[in-house]
């Protein structure tokens, strides 16, 4: 452990798995000349509240690549079943004083760092919050109907009730707001390690959504509504969509 690691109080962890069932080798996929993981890392590094960014992986190719572009990566156990378990291993081994641990999914190359900061601020300002995650309003029918996009419903106090790949809520008669979940989780340390002690759950397995494991064991997830909605990479065909998004952003500034 490096001395500066032990002193970090707020860290960002980017889980990056090589053998993704949907897209093997995804972290190194090129997007306009830069890898997916490099773009995600560089965007996260713009956060004003994270003391350290670290890639958590199970593959030496990713370690070498992150080191080559000047990032920081560590090897985690191949037995980790999801990104949150990988995040927890990093926090336990390398950052014993970290009070807030942000799990930033490695497939969010266009994530605005202001989203990360908003989660950290909400976690710090709300004593009852133990896990905060962002959602964004959508009116796009394709996004609402596809199983690739996770939807979230929450109560009047901003506490998540459920996450699903199905369209929720069901729209019966009139237009109802639909919120998409963005794959970032800001944990208080105690909540993260409590999650790691929980066994897998039926709904989490059925939907293939790790956050449901936290809900099913009685945990409370607070949502943070954000304006920033950007494309993620789940399948090879998503690369072209992300490249188009980046091109449109570039054209808007020049």
Curated annotation (Swiss-Prot):
Pathway: Nucleotide-sugar biosynthesis; CMP-3-deoxy-D-manno-octulosonate biosynthesis; CMP-3-deoxy-D-manno-octulosonate from 3-deoxy-D-manno-octulosonate and CTP: step 1/1; Bacterial outer membrane biogenesis; lipopolysaccharide biosynthesis. One of its GO terms (molecular function) is 3-deoxy-manno-octulosonate cytidylyltransferase activity. Its EC number is 2.7.7.38. Gene3D superfamilies: Spore Coat Polysaccharide Biosynthesis Protein SpsA, Chain A. It catalyses: 3-deoxy-alpha-D-manno-oct-2-ulosonate + CTP = CMP-3-deoxy-beta-D-manno-octulosonate + diphosphate. Keywords: Cytoplasm, Lipopolysaccharide biosynthesis, Nucleotidyltransferase, Transferase. SUPFAM superfamilies: Nucleotide-diphospho-sugar transferases (SSF53448). It is found in: Cytoplasm. CDD domains: CMP-KDO-Synthetase. One of its GO terms (biological process) is CMP-keto-3-deoxy-D-manno-octulosonic acid biosynthetic process. GO terms for cellular component: cytosol. InterPro entries: Cytidylyl_trans, KdsB, Nucleotide-diphossugar_trans. Belongs to the KdsB family. Activates KDO (a required 8-carbon sugar) for incorporation into bacterial lipopolysaccharide in Gram-negative bacteria. NCBIfam families: kdsB (TIGR00466), PRK05450.1-3 (NF003950), PRK05450.1-5 (NF003952), PRK13368.1 (NF009905). PANTHER family: 3-DEOXY-MANNO-OCTULOSONATE CYTIDYLYLTRANSFERASE, 3-DEOXY-MANNO-OCTULOSONATE CYTIDYLYLTRANSFERASE, MITOCHONDRIAL. This is 3-deoxy-manno-octulosonate cytidylyltransferase.
């Amino acid at each position: 452990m490096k001395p500066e690691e032990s002193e970090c109080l707020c860290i960002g962890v980017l889980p990056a798995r090589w053998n993704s069932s949907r897209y093997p080798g995804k972290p190194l996929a090129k997007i306009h000349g830069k890898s997916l993981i490099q773009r995600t890392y560089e965007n996260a590094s713009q956060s004003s509240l994270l003391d350290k960014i670290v890639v958590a992986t199970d593959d030496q190719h990713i370690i070498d690549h992150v080191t080559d572009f000047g990032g920081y990566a560590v090897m985690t156990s191949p037995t980790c079943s999801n990104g949150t378990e990988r995040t927890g291993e990093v926090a336990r081994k390398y950052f014993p004083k970290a009070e807030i641990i942000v799990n930033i999914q490695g497939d969010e190359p266009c994530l605005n760092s202001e989203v990360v900061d908003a989660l950290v601020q909400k976690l710090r300002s709300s004593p009852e919050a133990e896990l905060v995650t962002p959602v964004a309003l959508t009116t796009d029918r394709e996004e609402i109907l596809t199983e690739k996009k996770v939807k979230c419903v929450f109560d009047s106090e901003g506490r998540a009730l459920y996450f699903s790949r199905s369209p929720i809520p069901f729209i019966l008669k009139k237009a109802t707001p639909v919120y998409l979940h963005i794959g970032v989780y800001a944990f208080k340390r105690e909540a993260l390690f409590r999650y790691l002690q929980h066994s897998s759950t039926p709904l989490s397995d059925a939907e293939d959504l790790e956050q449901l494991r936290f809900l099913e064991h009685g945990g409370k997830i607070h949502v943070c509504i954000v304006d920033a909605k950007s494309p993620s990479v789940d399948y090879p065909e998503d690369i072209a969509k992300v490249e188009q998004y980046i091109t449109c952003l570039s054209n808007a500034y020049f």
